[in-house]
Amino acid sequence: VRINSKLLLAVAVMPLLFTATAKAELNVFACEAEYAALAKALAPSADIYSATTAMQDPHQVQARPSLIAKMRQADLVVCAGADLEIGWLPMLQMKASNPKVKSTDKGLFFAADQVDTLDKLASVDRSMGDVHAKGNPHLHLDPERMLSIAQALSAKMIKLDPQNSSEYQQSLADFSQRWQAKIPQWQEQAKGLAGKKVIAYHSSFRYLFNWTGIEQVADLEPKPGLAPTSSHLASLLTRAEQGDVMAVIVASYQDERGAKWLGERANLPVLMLPMSVGGNEQSQDLFSLYDSLLALLNGVK
């Protein structure tokens, strides 16, 4: 009996091909580190790239050639939305010319479209500074909203890559189970923070404060997007001298000079909080990001 060696080879290779295609291999471009981390949790075998780190201001990004190349390869683009990336994402999309990620009915996903945002504005003008009419975009620091976003992102992945739907469903189930188990623990840790007052830079931690019950009584920015001025810092010092402020808070990517000036003169601790995954050594994923934020806030004496 003659054995066709080519046929044997083809039969031998078939299981390998099947194994290769059975893994979800979406190319994911995340605008921020938190959404790269979420995408990794929901699609562990996907190829994921983050355009920014927790040490960068996601409002201000240059449409560099490396970013254009990455977006050109993307099957899915995951961003905060609510116009956080309005200064650079449209330019990047135009230069990349990738039809797969041009619109939200295809491979473009905005987290802010999946949940209610805080602080929506009916109208906006330039005198108001760098504000977002669609609401505050920094919504990854609310655990309930993040769970809703995870469910919607998983559904988007299944729509784009239906042959691997079982992997996405299993990953979402694993993430949701772990996340829902942590929420009551985080709520317990946050109990002592309710009613505490802080002065913070920008509205970066609006959702975290809203969830924990912390009150931001003043902003280091005179207007959103403007650096602290000496006259504004002087007015903040007057506010801080009322004696009810727990700390001055800045995010990992923000300039802390104004905060340090105020902290020294008002005798207040200055707390640098991780804005996202990678914002400090402890924040290696979304779970440890929340753990670190609560530990730092509870550590203020």
Where would I find each of the regions flagged by the language model?
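Bacterial N-terminal signal peptides
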Residues: 8-19
